[in-house]
């Protein structure tokens, strides 16, 4: 048996450093957090070659007293806490006392520091945990750390670092997170002698978001401000149009610390679920202050936390974010194509160029128009449809949209559903430029006229149906386009989910019943999830052996192959390894609603589309179908006139 021996201090330090210093980004994080704890108002981060060869952190904080400099590099030496009880209430970013010891064990470190009260500063040099110099030096107030040749004495660790460009991008991302966490501190980031980021430190969180993420995101934000018995949260979330395919744009800060939290992420993603496409994630910059005790001593990076009351925090945060999203009208606006027109190439010809045929034809048309008699009123006669449909005032049953496929005349008139205000004649073709945000979701203020309201519906002007799928509606100075399939799918989905929540799902008997033969796995899933299946409105009875009989089906889902849908449901339950049952139910309701909804190319009548709009009005979130596609988009009068070059 090998002898058991105590490791020497150098080996211990290198092993400990491996937990704290994973890459150059870790060095920057630890040193900048120390600078923040020192009360700095300006911090400069400079790196070269991705921070592998050179890192310099400069701050104007309180500095380190001369007799404390060497002690600061001992393991577990800190000014942040004094006992284990302090871990639950610690407010500083650092507290373990391991950072300087770990960094100096695997790099060449130079420290220059001066306190406000001292006349001169201190220069301290340490390499591989060995002190090389400790001397007085002239220096400004604050602290400067210079870290060179990271992992110079641990070649195995250095070998596994990525390229300088990749390591530099990690540092850039970390500096951005630190700048977001403390908008009252001016951050400057220099990479290979080029300034990549410089914030003002004016405390304005939206300014920081603009500096880091740009105008598109900063102009599409919703403010969050909420306080409850568990926490206080402030900051911004992105409108549903701002999404990413990963969680890189989810930023959470707790008591000034950038953290990654599954509880917070899941709560916010649940709130966004009905507003986003599948596998898309929102943009968030949220600042939390928790009133209960927190455990930040979970991971050496201090980026993970534990809460006392996970469930309460989850529910409160999810409800808060959903309320903000649900009470804003966010209809995607079609952007104007900003691609500049190609420049015309002008050729010189010595002989006169013959007048193009197209120009002559246009001139002839204009001449013919000028000879027209405008005094006579021309009325278009519309042939009434011979197909019988429900009258406008006739109440529609819930399944009207599904059971009636009414063919109407090809020439659909413009129908006004209320007392629409006729537009005033234009007195001039000159238009004042308006401020337009293109490619975003327009959030209307409290005093703007909202599209999906009862009062607004009285002023709708339904123009007609386009491609037998989209309904065109004029309101105020915008054209709204409703996707009849997505809208009906959303209505069915919300009705089904409401019935599930209230446990009042009703069924309709079918004759003859559907008889199916299930295999062993399907039988197991049926018995395991029978309560959930019966909640949908199915009535399933054992018919002997592997035979099962469906005698009743959900009463609000029509025109669906119920046998295939039932088998598909059992397959989904079978494939849902490790997933929450409510998530499976939600997805299945969305699938059922999609299949039962009116399809594209289905001709709807005016009463039917009015019924559909009325049902949309009753929803908290009528803007997206269950899969995240928009139900309504809009195009402003300004944008249409821009397309026709009436506005240049």
UniProtKB/Swiss-Prot annotation:
InterPro entries: DNA_mismatch_repair_CS, DNA_mismatch_repair_MutL, DNA_mismatch_S5_2-like, HATPase_C_sf, MutL/Mlh/PMS, MutL/Mlh/Pms-like, MutL_C, MutL_C_dimsub. Residues 396-430 have a biased composition (Polar residues). It holds the Pfam family DNA_mis_repair. GO terms for biological process: mismatch repair. Belongs to the DNA mismatch repair MutL/HexB family. The keyword DNA-binding does not apply. This is DNA mismatch repair protein MutL. HAMAP family: DNA_mis_repair. GO terms for cellular component: mismatch repair complex. Keywords: DNA damage, DNA repair. It comes from the Bacteria. This protein is involved in the repair of mismatches in DNA. It is required for dam-dependent methyl-directed DNA mismatch repair. May act as a 'molecular matchmaker', a protein that promotes the formation of a stable complex between two or more DNA-binding proteins in an ATP-dependent manner without itself being part of a final effector complex. The gene is mutL. Residues 385-430 are annotated as: Disordered. GO terms for molecular function: ATP binding; ATP hydrolysis activity; ATP-dependent DNA damage sensor activity; mismatched DNA binding. The keyword DNA damage applies.
């Amino acid at each position: 048996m090998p002898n058991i021996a105590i490791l020497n201090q150098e080996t211990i330090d290198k092993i400990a450093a491996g937990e704290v210093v994973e890459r150059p980004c870790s060095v920057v994080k630890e040193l900048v957090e120390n600078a923040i704890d020192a009360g700095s108002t300006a911090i400069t981060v400079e790196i070269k070659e991705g921070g592998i060869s050179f890192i310099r952190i400069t701050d104007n904080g309180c500095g380190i007293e001369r007799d404390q400099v060497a002690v600061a590099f001992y393991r577990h030496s800190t000014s942040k806490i004094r006992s284990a009880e302090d871990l639950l209430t610690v407010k500083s970013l650092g507290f373990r006392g391991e950072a300087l010891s770990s960094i100096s064990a695997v790099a060449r470190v130079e420290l220059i520091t001066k306190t406000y009260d001292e006349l001169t500063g201190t220069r301290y040099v340490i390499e591989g945990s060995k002190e090389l110099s400790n001397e007085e030096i002239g220096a400004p107030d604050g602290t400067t750390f210079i870290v060179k040749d990271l992992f110079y004495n641990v070649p195995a660790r250095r070998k596994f670092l990525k390229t300088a460009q990749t390591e530099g991008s990690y540092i850039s991302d970390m500096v951005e997170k630190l700048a977001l966490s403390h908008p009252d501190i001016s951050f400057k980031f220099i990479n290979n002698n080029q300034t990549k980021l410089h914030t003002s430190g004016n405390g304005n969180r939206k300014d920081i978001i603009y500096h880091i993420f740009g105008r598109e995101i900063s102009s599409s934000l919703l403010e969050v401000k909420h306080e409850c018995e568990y926490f206080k949260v402030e900051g911004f979330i992105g409108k549903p149009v701002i999404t990413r395919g990963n969680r890189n744009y989810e930023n959470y800060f707790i008591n000034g610390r950038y953290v990654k939290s599954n509880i917070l992420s899941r709560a916010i993603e649940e709130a966004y679920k009905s507003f986003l496409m599948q596998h898309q994630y929102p943009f968030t910059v949220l600042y939390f202050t928790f009133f209960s005790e927190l455990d930040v001593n979970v991971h050496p990076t201090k980026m993970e936390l534990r809460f006392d009351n996970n469930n309460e925090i989850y529910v409160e945060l999810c409800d808060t974010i959903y309320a903000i999203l649900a009470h804003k009208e966010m209809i995607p606006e079609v952007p104007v194509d900003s691609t500049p027109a190609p420049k015309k190439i002008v050729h010189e010809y010595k002989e006169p160029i013959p007048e193009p045929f197209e120009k002559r034809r246009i001139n002839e048309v204009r001449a013919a128009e000028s000879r027209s008699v405008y005094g006579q009123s021309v009325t278009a006669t519309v042939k009434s449809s011979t197909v019988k449909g429900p009258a406008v005032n006739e109440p529609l049953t819930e399944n009207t949209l599904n059971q009636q496929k009414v063919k109407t005349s090809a020439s659909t008139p413009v129908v006004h559903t209320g007392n629409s205000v006729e537009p005033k004649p234009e007195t001039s073709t000159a238009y004042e430029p308006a401020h337009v945000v293109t490619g975003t979701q327009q959030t209307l203020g409290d005093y703007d006229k909202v599209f999906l309201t009862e009062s607004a519906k009285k002023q709708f002007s339904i123009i007609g149906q386009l491609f037998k799928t989209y309904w065109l509606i004029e309101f105020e100075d915008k054209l709204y386009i409703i996707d009849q399939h997505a809208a009906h799918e959303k209505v069915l989905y919300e009705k089904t989910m409401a019935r599930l929540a209230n446990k009042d799902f009703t069924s309709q008997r079918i004759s003859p019943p559907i008889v199916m033969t299930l295999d062993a796995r399907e039988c197991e899933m049926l018995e395991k999830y029978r309560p959930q299946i019966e909640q949908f409105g199915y009535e399933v009875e054992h018919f002997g052996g592997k035979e099962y009989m469906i005698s009743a089906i959900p009463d609000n889902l029509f025109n669906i192959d119920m046998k295939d849908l039932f088998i598909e449901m059992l397959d989904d339950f079978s494939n849902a390894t490790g997933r929450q049952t409510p998530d499976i139910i939600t997805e299945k309701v969305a699938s059922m609603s999609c299949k039962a909804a009116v399809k594209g190319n289905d001709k709807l009548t005016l009463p039917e589309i009015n019924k559909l709009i009325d049902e949309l009005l009753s929803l908290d979130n009528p803007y997206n179908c269950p899969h995240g596609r928009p139900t309504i988009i809009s195009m402003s009068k300004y944008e249409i006139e821009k397309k026709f070059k009436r506005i240049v």
